[in-house]
Amino acid sequence: MAETAPLRVQLIARTEFTVPPDVPWETDAEGGAALVEFAGRACYQSWSKPNPRTATNASYLRHIIDVGHLSVLEHASVSFYITGISRSCTHELIRHRHFSYSQLSQRYVPENDSQVVVPPGIEGDAELEGLFTAAADASRAAYAELLAKLEAKLMGDEPREGRATLRRKQARQAARSVLPNATETRIVVTGNYRAWRHFIAMRASEHADLEIRRLAIACLRELVAVAPAVFADFEIYPLADGTEVATTPLVTEA
């Protein structure tokens, strides 16, 4: 029986920032948030912080977002390693073209023991989960049988390791066609702050597919911990059905 994989979002990289020694400026933040403020002040050379209403990093970044000067958010970035996500969900995720992606390859990695992600609409219903599990198991059995026969067919009398590696890839790329969209995949996603804000605004919405909405909420929680001045304006709240959404009163895209 196929095992299920829980969603996991792990922070693996974030922006660091060093103030140039010849710039007479300091701030009360660090990392990406400091870099965003520096970039904004560089446009106007406002190192002395002439406006007391934007003298702190948090107040400056809130003003930047509120007026839609979002380009400065593009200087700072965050990378996540995401597991327990379905192939169908990553098909939606990769439509966000300002992110960079590195995803598990089904040509190089055999999927005989792959896990599955139970769709939220099926989750918790014993009858539906039974049907889902049976279908997933049948797909994996077909994959294993196809893979074995394709490898036997393609290998032929070519014992050389280089050719054998190629033939195995060719067998996997053909056999994977029967794997379900619910097959778990793993992916590294890197995006700048502006791209992440856009993603959260689009995918943490009630109108988004529930699996990618859960992903957006999980990413948001990590992003708020990394750069609260940039992401804490998003409020997470529950809906009547027990799921969560996130919204912000500020500008998400100019």
Curated annotation (Swiss-Prot):
CDD domains: ThyX
Enzyme Commission (EC) number: 2.1.1.148
Active site: R203
Example of a GO biological process term: dTMP biosynthetic process
Keywords: FAD, Flavoprotein, Methyltransferase, NADP, Nucleotide biosynthesis, Transferase
Cross-referenced SUPFAM superfamilies: Thymidylate synthase-complementing protein Thy1
Cofactor(s) this protein cannot do without: FAD
Pathway the protein takes part in: Pyrimidine metabolism; dTTP biosynthesis
Cofactor note: Binds 4 FAD per tetramer. Each FAD binding site is formed by three monomers.
Residue ranges annotated for the ThyX domain, each copy included: 7-237
Binding site for FAD: S71, R95, H96, R97, Q103, N192, Y193, R194, H198
The UniProt record lists the keyword NADP: yes
Protein residues bound to dUMP: E92, L93, I94, R95, Q103, L104, S105, Q106, R107, R176, R203
Keyword Transmembrane assigned: no
A Pfam family of this chain: Thy1
GO MF, one example: NADPH binding
Motif ThyX motif boundaries: 95-105
Catalytic activity: dUMP + (6R)-5,10-methylene-5,6,7,8-tetrahydrofolate + NADPH + H(+) = dTMP + (6S)-5,6,7,8-tetrahydrofolate + NADP(+)
Role according to the record: Catalyzes the reductive methylation of 2'-deoxyuridine-5'-monophosphate (dUMP) to 2'-deoxythymidine-5'-monophosphate (dTMP) while utilizing 5,10-methylenetetrahydrofolate (mTHF) as the methyl donor, and NADPH and FADH(2) as the reductant.
HAMAP family: ThyX (MF_01408)
Family to which this protein belongs: Belongs to the thymidylate synthase ThyX family.
Subunit structure as annotated in this protein's UniProt entry: Homotetramer.
Name under which the protein is recorded: Flavin-dependent thymidylate synthase
